[in-house]
A protein has these predicted regions:
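Flexible "cap/lid" loop of the alpha/beta hydrolase fold
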Residues: 1-24
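Conserved alpha/beta-hydrolase "acid-adjacent" motif
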Residues: 97-103
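C-terminal alpha-helix
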Residues: 135-143
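Short, structured coil segments at secondary-structure junctions
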Residues: 84, 110-111
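Short beta-strand/loop motif that positions the catalytic acidic residue
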Residues: 84, 90-92, 96
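General small-molecule cofactor/ligand-binding pocket signal
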Residues: 116
Length: 144
C-alpha cells in the first residue's frame, strides 16, 4: 500500500502489470510479478518452475484485475493514518520491488506503531519468511 502519492517503484510495477494484462500476456505477467515479489534466493530455487505456473495462472477477470491494479495508484490514505489508534504492526521487506521498503517505514511513522523489516526478502515476505505467521500471532496475542 502506498500512502502518499506514488513512488517510481510502484508506478512501474503497476503500469507493467496493467499493460501485460491488457495484452493478455499472462506468462510475462506471472514472471514479472514473481521477479518483483520474491527474493533472489527464492527465485533461484523456483524460477525453473515459472513456465509451468504461467500455464495455470491468470487473472480470473481481466477488467477487474486492471481496475484494482490502477486503483492502487490513486489510493491516498496518508492523512487518515493518524486516526488508527489500536496497536498496529507494519511488516515490510528491505528488497521489496513492488512498493519499496519506504512505504512500510512511512506507514509505521505516520501511525506511530511497531515496525518490522525483513532484511533479505521482498514483497512476498509473508510467503517466504518462516516466522511470519508466528510474528503476527505473537503481536496479536501480546498482553492477553
Amino acid at each position: 500500500m502506498q500512502c502518499r502519492g506514488n513512488n517510481d517503484t510502484v508506478e512501474k510495477a503497476i503500469d507493467e502489470w496493467v499493460d501485460l494484462t491488457e495484452k493478455e500476456d499472462y506468462r510475462a505477467l506471472v514472471c514479472d510479478m514473481a521477479e518483483r515479489m520474491y527474493s533472489d534466493k527464492y527465485l533461484k530455487a523456483y524460477r525453473p518452475l515459472l513456465p509451468l505456473l504461467t500455464m495455470v495462472q491468470k487473472p480470473k477477470d481481466k477488467e477487474r484485475f486492471i481496475t484494482l491494479a490502477k486503483s492502487c495508484l490513486s489510493c491516498d490514505t496518508y492523512e487518515s493514518l493518524n486516526k488508527i489508534k489500536c496497536p498496529t504492526l507494519v511488516i515490510g521487506a528491505r528488497e521489496d520491488k513492488v512498493v519499496g521498503v519506504s512505504g512500510s517505514i512511512e506507514l509505521a511513522e505516520k501511525i506511530g506503531c511497531e515496525l518490522y523489516i525483513y532484511e533479505h526478502l521482498g514483497h512476498a515476505a509473508y510467503e517466504e519468511a518462516g516466522d511470519f505467521n508466528k510474528r503476527v500471532f505473537d503481536f496479536l496475542t501480546r498482553g492477553k
